[in-house]
Amino acid sequence: MGYFSNVMRLGRGIVFLFLTLWAIGWMSGCKYFDPDANFIDDHKVWEKIKKEAPELGLDPNFVYAICHAESSLNGNAQSSIARGMMQLTEAAWSAVTNLHYRTAFQWETNVEVGMLYLKRLKGMLESVDMFNYPRLAASYRYGYNALRKEQYMVSRMKTPINRIYRKLFAGQLSPVEPPEN
């Protein structure tokens, strides 16, 4: 009986160690444990988008949802190929502005350039009479040429893992509730 209880105790210890290491790993990937994160107040972001998006012919709710989907409003978000709150690549950035790409971490500038890029994509879709917001979301997420290759059919695109993008692809224009004043 002593041997069996020692094995059980060891097994519980290994399970506890595994769960502890898993929790630490999960939390280190959590946005609240990112020491370089710069989460911008949702009211500030919403006010900027609400004012400027309509001037560019964009729905503010859609733009706000893209910001959340791309970075959870983290002005310092960075992947291997994209920067800032709207996670713009250098190619997308350069297509719509002459500003240096190093300014992509300034959240206001990033949102302005991101909206210019969305306006550009919208114009490209309108030029072939294919504009709708699910297509705009798909072309922002995967690239205009990827959408064109699939004959502008969003249903043929890879289903995004991101919940917000899944809702945008399905036609929901405002999957993220903007803050109240």
Where are these regions (language model features)?
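Second-shell loop/turn segments in exported
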Residues: 34-39, 49-53, 74-82, 96-108, ...
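Export/targeting segments at the very N-terminus of extracytoplasmic proteins
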Residues: 23-73, 108-111, 172-180
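Residue-level detector of well-ordered alpha-helical segments, enriched
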Residues: 62-63, 84, 132, 136
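Cell-wall polysaccharide-cleaving catalytic domain and substrate-binding groove, primarily
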Residues: 49, 66-94, 117, 143
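Extracellular/periplasmic catalytic domains that process cell-envelope and extracellular macromolecules
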Residues: 55-59, 79, 130-132
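Catalytic and substrate-binding regions of cell-wall glycan-acting enzymes that process beta-1,4-linked
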Residues: 131-181
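Alpha-helical segment that forms one wall of the substrate-binding/catalytic cleft
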Residues: 90-149
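N-terminal Sec-pathway targeting helices
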Residues: 2-18
